[in-house]
Amino acid sequence: IRQLAFGDAFTTYVGQQFESICMQWLMRMNAERSRLPFLATRFGKWWGADPRRREQTDIDVVLADPQTKRVLLGECTWRNSFNETEAVEALLGREGLIPGYDDTRFMVFSKHPMSNATRDRYAGKVDFVTAEELYRR
């Protein structure tokens, strides 16, 4: 019974809530004009067909300003371990899926800090935020 209550279903539920927490943090940072590369006027998530991969995909958090044609795409990962490079590359591969934006920024939210190697590899391309950072002032 414990496995049923705290197994995959629980992890999936917490992962979905983590996406909501990440969006709330982004909205707060936007309101404070802090930590974000632009002032967003639209917030949400995206799902649809990726014509390059010929599959359905989603983007966990999306912030946009249609007037300046800037968009931020975010991945929210609530797992103890995962392939960091694969997750970041998948997010980078989603650039261009939302038409009408010329400047795309990326942010990865994770339960635990990304490795230094991953942070160094994607420095300047991707911002990384941990669950702990979401609650700092």
Describe the predicted segments one by one.
Residues 1-137:
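A cross-kingdom feature that marks ATP-driven nucleic-acid transaction machinery
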